[in-house]
A protein has these predicted regions:
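The catalytic-center signature of Zn2+-dependent metalloproteases
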Residues: 34, 356-377, 439-496
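Bacterial N-terminal signal peptides that target proteins for export
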Residues: 1-10, 17
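Conserved catalytic/binding loops enriched for acidic/polar residues
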Residues: 462-817
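Zn2+-dependent metallopeptidase catalytic core
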Residues: 83, 325-351
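C-terminal segment of classical bacterial N-terminal signal peptides
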Residues: 16-26
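Stable alpha-helical elements in mature extracytoplasmic
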Residues: 328-335, 437, 441, 445, ...
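Auxiliary tRNA-acceptor-end handling modules of aminoacyl-tRNA synthetases
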Residues: 29-324, 342, 357-412, 416-432, ...
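Extended catalytic-interface subdomain
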Residues: 385, 390, 396-404, 445-453, ...
Length: 817
């Protein structure tokens, strides 16, 4: 066709189309003008709307995220601005069918920190690898760390739908909240005295509620388990027992932390998070321990710098369960707030507050991670438990809990009766008077609150005062019973009836407690430089390292140090034992007279057992002098000795005293009391074999001490003294008593055990230990290594490896049975 014809045809077509368009316009305009919607074009529904259409949806909307429940499944509507941002999630027990195995308010696994990232078409959940301390790393080192310590991908989620504007993504999160998750242990493996195994019934899992707030959201889920439980792992107390629990899962954003990490010092007892550092000036890595502590910043920094007490910008706030009996609430408050005195030593006024559970605050939820609570558990356990949860990046504590069980009164009565009934007539009954109950409850709360603040128990404190000082009314009024309430001591059990006015309860913060809080919570305006803080803190501890009342020591797994004992008191274990056993004998002789309204003798049985255990504890404390090595964390710059062996004469005195007491141990029993039918089997008789074992277990301690000091009490001298005491009656032509016969059998067994030629065994040290201590020690001893701190102040460097306060500082040895 000719080109001109084609052009004409195209023009005609365009004119025709335009005419049609113009022709349609008036009709459309007319329709709109008269409100006729029948001809509107229906907008296509977006995918987000379609996803929820015609479904039964329960929704909780908040400023942070939105939660949906559809057919028993939980959906998280996450704003895409949070992709790549760190979040935190944890699980708390909300209700239970059996508080003996599952406590309301407890968290049986630490909260997890994670983030969601979009990768291809899925959303990946990643756990930050926070094991490496990366502050101040050079760019080259930072790149190497990123390659070798990358974040872990733990789970993937296929997006259900995005909002139309892509501002949020909807994820099905059943794997985190309604299914068994590796991140959250719901039923603990240990609860009080019970060892527990459990299996979950997935068909009996129900979503009970959703909540969404400005800064967090939560899902409440009912779960059902089959539980097996045993007492101390021996006696089965539950088999395939059904257990129902409601669990609240909380998710919240983790803001970029401005908390300054504080490097732990092994000489000050703080809980820690372990990390690894790669300092530029070292050719190897070193451990870093970040102390756990709440972040406190003074409101008025200028006043604080001048030494004036200042309130913190954000206080440590605890909410008190309204379920507590009215008579419990005041002593609980006092017990918590007692720590404000210690915070004043760090420059803060009113650092801690205790508030009632709010009645009209819709944001408040005691099962929410954002709230720290003191919970009441009405069950048979006789204890107080505590926990805190930290930011793994910095060690900052963001939440804490105290759990107080209903039967704690029974524990307090037992401890106070055994500890003070010899000197305090008020205690001589089946229950504590109200005033003493409140005093005891307040003391226990204060002691447990230390753990919530990040502190560790200090088992060295109770041996700091002399035994005689603890009998002085003036001294104990001014200084308390120990330099730290964090020791295991509760009552002044060595006080005698003649010690008028002496303090009987360990309810006073000591000088160590004030020192420890000052170390952990003092604010330094050093521009957020943890290395500069560490330098200052190391110097402060160095200056006071020789003060005996500030000594800290962690719990011993194997008893080596006689000054670090659970429930010891005073610096002379033998004198303390003699005074205490005098009190125990007096209490035992009056037990039936003082404990009335006890028709089945259950209370008397329990107290009688506690008396026997009290005797045994005193023997063990005195026994710890034999082969005893006093251990102390020290830096090279302080020149303090790490190990000091108990003087030889004192060791031998203690061993001979122990042997005399052991042979007469059965004589302490009240046979008339036992024959009345209260006791099925004598507790004193039951402990005899334990005593024999304890006596022979002293060998390893003596080997350790001999390695530290070759001139100390030796293994040969130990066996000579043991032989003379064991066979004294036989040598004198007398019949040995039951305990002596047990000791003789054990001695013969040990004498021939492991010998090459039993006929060469001689009285005294067994043949298998001939040549000890040197040869025996050389083969069997294994001294633990302790951190040999480099001098952090040299060259202006700070050694981040300030030590782990919970690590053992005690030497160990193994001896053949």
């Amino acid at each position: 066709m000719h080109k001109s014809c084609i052009r004409c045809l195209l023009v005609a077509t365009a004119i025709s189309a335009g005419s049609l368009s113009l022709a349609a316009a008036p009709s459309a305009l007319s329709s709109r003008a008269f409100g006729d919607d029948t001809k509107k074009e229906k907008k296509e529904e977006d995918k987000y709307t379609k996803f929820f259409k015609d479904k039964k949806v329960e929704t909780a909307r908040g400023k942070f995220v939105t939660l949906h429940k559809i057919d028993g499944s939980v959906y998280l509507e996450l704003p895409t601005k949070y992709l790549g941002k760190e979040l935190m999630m944890g699980a708390k027990i909300t209700s239970t069918t059996d508080p003996d195995y599952l406590a309301v308010g407890s968290m049986n696994s630490a909260p997890i920190v994670f983030r969601f990232e979009k990768q291809d078409s899925v959303i990946v959940m990643k756990a930050p690898n926070s094991i490496v301390y990366r502050r101040d790393a050079s760019p080259e080192l930072q790149k190497a760390l990123e390659l070798n310590y990358r974040d872990q991908s733990v789970e993937s989620f296929t997006p259900e739908v995005y909002k139309a504007d892509s501002s949020a993504v909807v994820l099905k999160i059943n794997s985190l909240v309604t299914e068994s998750s590796p991140f959250f242990e719901i039923v603990p493996s240990q609860q009080g005295p019970f060892k527990i195994t459990s299996s979950r019934n997935s068909s009996l899992t129900f979503v009970r509620g959703l909540k969404a707030f400005d800064t967090n959201a939560s899902v409440r889920v009912e779960m059902n388990f089959s539980v097996n439980a045993s007492l101390m792992g021996v006696l089965t107390v539950a088999k395939d027992m059904p257990l129902t629990a409601e669990v609240t899962y909380t998710i919240l954003p983790v803001e970029a932390s401005n908390a300054i990490p504080r490097f732990a010092d092994a000489r000050v007892g703080y809980q820690t998070t372990r990390k690894v550092s790669f300092p530029d000036y070292l050719d190897q890595s070193e451990p870093v321990y970040l102390a756990h502590r709440w972040q406190l910043v003074p409101k008025d920094k200028k006043a604080y710098a001048k030494g004036q007490l200042t309130e913190p910008e954000k206080k440590i706030v605890f909410y008190l369960d309204s379920a507590f009996p009215a008579s419990w609430q005041r002593p609980i408050r006092e017990g918590v707030l007692r720590w404000n005195k210690a915070f004043e030593a760090a420059g803060f006024r009113n650092a801690i507050e205790v508030r009632d559970f709010p009645k009209n605050d819709k944001q408040f939820d005691p099962d929410n991670l954002e709230y720290s609570c003191i919970r009441y558990i009405p069950n048979s356990q006789e204890t107080i438990a505590s926990s805190n949860w930290t930011d793994p990046r910095t060690g900052e504590i963001f939440s804490g809990n105290l759990t107080i069980y209903n039967n704690v009164e029974a524990l307090m009565h037992k401890q106070r009766f055994i500890g003070t009934a010899a000197v305090d007539p008020q205690v001589r009954s089946s229950r504590l008077p109200q005033a003493l109950f409140e005093e005891s409850l307040s003391q226990l709360v204060t002691q447990e609150m230390g753990s919530v603040l990040g502190l560790l128990r200090n088992y060295a404190a109770s041996a700091s005062y002399t035994t005689d000082q603890l009998r002085s009314a003036k001294f104990t009024k001014e200084s308390g019973l120990t330099p730290s309430i964090l020791d295991g001591v509760t009552y002044n059990y060595l006080a005698q009836p003649s010690d008028k006015g002496v303090r009987l309860i360990n309810d006073q913060l000591g000088v160590y407690d004030l020192f420890a809080i000052d170390w952990g919570y003092r604010y330094f305006d050093l521009k957020g430089d943890p290395a500069a803080e560490a330098k200052e803190l190391l110097s402060r501890v160095d200056k006071r390292a020789r003060e005996p009342y500030l000594r800290y020591a962690p719990e011993q797994r194997y008893a080596v140090d006689p000054t670090v004992r659970t429930e010891d008191l005073g610096n002379d274990p033998i004198k303390t034992a003699e005074l205490t056993m005098k009190n125990l004998a007096f209490i035992q002789s009056n037990l039936s007279k003082w404990i009335t309204n006890d028709p089945d003798s259950r209370k008397k049985k329990s107290l009688y057992l506690a008396i026997v255990q009290g005797y045994y504890l005193q023997l063990k404390n005195a026994m710890s002098l034999v082969g005893g090595v006093v251990c102390q964390e020290s830096r090279l710059s302080t020149s303090l000795p790490r190990y000091q062996v108990v003087p030889k004469a004192k060791q031998r005195e203690a061993f001979q005293w122990l042997l005399r007491e052991a042979k007469d141990f059965q004589g302490k029993a009240d046979r008339n009391f036992e024959r009345k039918g209260f006791i099925d089997v004598s507790y004193y008789d039951q402990l005899l074999e334990f005593l024999v074992k304890d006596i022979y277990d002293l060998r390893s301690r003596i080997i350790i001490a001999s390695q530290v000091d070759s001139k100390t009490y030796s293994l040969g001298e130990y066996f000579d003294d043991l032989y003379q005491a064991t066979f004294a009656s036989t040598i004198a032509g007398k019949s040995p008593n039951h305990m002596e016969r047990l000791m003789q059998i054990a001695f013969i067994d040990k004498s021939i055990a492991g010998t090459v030629n039993p006929r060469n065994a001689t009285p005294g040290m067994p043949y298998s230990f001939a040549g000890a201590p040197a040869s025996v020690g050389g083969k069997l001893i294994s001294l633990t290594s302790t951190t040999d701190y480099s001098d952090a102040l040299k060259s202006g460097r700070v050694n981040y490896g300030g030590g782990d306060p919970s690590a053992s500082i005690y030497p160990m040895a193994n001896v053949p049975a």
